[in-house]
Amino acid sequence: MKARAGAWLIAGLLLGELAALAPRVLAAQEVAVPVAVQVPILVKILNFDRNLAGRAAGRLVVGVLFQSRYRTSANVADEVCLALQALPAGALGAMELSCVAIDLDATSALDSALKRNRVQVLYVSPLRAVALGDVTAVSRAAGITTLTGVPRYVETGLAIGLDMKGERPEIVINLAASRAEGADLTAHLLKLARVVGDGAGGQ
């Protein structure tokens, strides 16, 4: 009973935060919601993954995938790491949260980089001339949950992202992708989200 009440409390807080956010537009960028706004929401969403605590074992490492030769990508990655570092203690309950930037332009083997840094969650910045399927193949094989601020990446195969719906941020979830990466998202979260991909019709 307490667990259910806690889940609804988190859901209420998340809905309140989404409703309170004013619209902001980032010109010439692919992210739909400003990084400083999206990161706290995405981290709250992670609280709805029933499998995350067991996989993280007290310490969650968020990898931030970017391209150093693509300025937009590099700038977003910098902002994401800064936003993660600025989160208050307890943002993920008792789990310690850390960030590691992974430069795709300087990485010959993404799977090795993720394993070496013990990444459990991967934020994907805007990428250029990259086959997203190569990223999702690695994330699914390693059981790493993917996040992004680029809505179309979720439709293409990443697990969780944010879009704008009117004047408010909208949670977007590719349910099949999230399950393929090992996440077990609660029904409470799915009711708050726009579900896309193969799992959209059967939550």
Regions found by a protein language model. Name each.
Residues 2-5, 10, 17, 21-203:
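Short hydrophobic alpha-helices and adjacent helix-cap/hinge residues
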